[in-house]
Regions:
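Single conserved hydrophobic/aromatic residue that forms the stacking wall/gate
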Residues: 1-6, 11, 379-385
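Histidine/acidic-residue-rich, glycine-tolerant segments that coordinate divalent metal ions
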Residues: 21, 41, 55-67, 73-74, ...
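Active-site beta-strand termini and strand-to-loop segments that position acidic
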Residues: 22-27, 315
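Catalytic-core environment of secreted peptidases
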Residues: 26-62
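Short, flexible, mixed-charge acidic loops at enzyme active sites
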Residues: 45-56, 148-152, 335-344
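Short pre-catalytic strand/loop immediately N-terminal to key active-site residues, enriched for Gly-Thr
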Residues: 61-70, 350-358
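DPxDG-like acidic metal-binding loop motif
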Residues: 76-82
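Metal-dependent amide/peptide-bond hydrolase catalytic core
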Residues: 179-381
């Protein structure tokens, strides 16, 4: 943020912790919010480059290595480069640009904390929100745009099954929470296949099971951790409701007293879906096709990953928003990948190494083009979602 602090911008820092806003005003009546996330990941970098991360942080009282394994360094650099361009070329545009540097995206809290700390009372209210994200599976120099739902709602659910433990040789004298958990794990998969519309998408993944201590002991409880992914609010509510009902029905099937019914807890970690305003997405494709070339701009797929940028568009009144993907794979690596001779490191991999110069150039040029188009009225304001 030093590059922004030293400029003529109005600075708002420490918003919801380490959140940061820089406001660049230049007359006009249009306002664009451009956001980049900042946080790194607790991963030891293994890319072998000369500027490989050697930084550490404290996690649970221990020193752990960190690196930018999700491209947030590219995001920040693209934002700063975009800000420098608009600061130095004020004759070519009118309006207001709000540059947001957001912490804690990886844990899903950063955007919410900034909003709860009054972000939108500290800045001019935007007409549109923009953000970008690197892609570890597409070639540098390209852009991918997904109209409508682009990334998923993310929920974390904890379920504890209780029973009456005892000796493994005498299961008829117990109420076995391991068997109940097994019933639950298979049954919740029918939520997606039988309760959700086949046209829609969702995920219920049981990622953690903890129960029992020894071969011949039936435990008193089993703990499950579940990630739930969905797109619409209606599907999200349906999936969570069915998880609760299935857990309770299994308790009833096993003649458990009500004081031993399973506990289903929805963690306060909800990340809303990223919804790309369709009008904004369509116009962005047109603008970037002119800026980069039609052969560089593609329709992007919906993904079940989460991104808390969606929070910025859900404030009232709602703000049309767009998150677009920029390719980060070098031409050489991408060709080898297409020939099945190379596997590409994914985001969150210790070996993730973007083709940084070309990726940053694309991030900056794309962001400038989209912001200028809105401020200079090259297209009309998109209708609300």
């Amino acid at each position: 943020s030093c590059s922004l602090v030293g400029s003529e911008m109005c600075i708002r820092d420490s918003i919801g912790g380490n959140g940061f806003a820089a406001i660049l005003k230049n007359g006009g009546n249009k306002t664009v919010l451009f956001r980049a996330d900042m946080d790194a990941l607790p991963i030891k970098e293994e890319t072998g480059i000369s500027f490989e991360s050697v930084k550490t942080t404290k996690q649970n009282g221990m020193d752990v290595p960190i690196m930018h394994a999700c491209g947030h360094d590219i995001h920040m650099t693209s934002l700063i480069g975009t800000a420098e361009y608009f600061s130095k070329n004020k004759d070519s545009w009118k309006g207001t640009i709000v540059f947001i540097l957001q912490p804690a995206e990886e844990i899903g809290f950063g955007a919410r904390q900034m909003i709860n700390a009054g972000l939108f009372k500290k800045i001019p209210y935007p007409d549109i929100n923009l953000a970008l994200h690197v892609s570890a599976q597409t070639q540098s120099g390209t852009v991918h745009i997904t109209p409508g739902f682009a990334m998923a709602n993310v929920d974390s659910v904890d379920v504890t099954f209780y029973g009456e433990g005892g000796h493994g040789a005498y299961p008829h004298l117990t109420k076995d929470p391991i068997v109940m958990s097994s019933q639950f794990i298979t049954t919740v998969q029918t939520i997606i296949s039988r309760n959700l519309s086949p046209i829609n998408a969702g995920v219920v993944t049981v990622g953690s099971i903890h129960g029992g201590t020894k071969h011949n002991i039936i435990p008193n409880h089993v703990d499950l951790q579940i990630t739930v992914r969905s797109y619409s609010d209606e599907d999200r509510e349906l999936i969570i409701s069915r998880i609760k009902k299935i857990a309770e029905s299994i308790a009833i099937q096993n003649d458990l007293p009500k004081n031993l019914y399973p506990i289903v807890k929805l963690r306060d970690e909800y990340t809303p879906a990223v919804f790309n305003n369709p009008d904004l997405a369509m116009r962005a494709k047109e603008i970037l096709s002119k800026e980069l070339g039609k052969d560089k701009v593609f329709d992007g797929p919906q993904v079940m990953g989460g991104e808390d940028f969606g929070q910025f568009g859900r404030v009232e009144p709602k703000i049309p928003s767009l998150l677009f993907w920029i390719g980060a794979v070098s031409q050489k690596d991408y060709k080898e990948f297409l020939n099945n001779s190379k596997k590409l490191p994914s985001l969150h991999s210790s070996k993730f190494l973007p083709d940084y110069e070309k990726t940053i150039d694309t991030g900056i040029s794309s962001s400038i083009a989209l912001i200028e188009a809105h401020l200079c009225l090259l297209y009309t304001s998109p209708s609300p979602r």
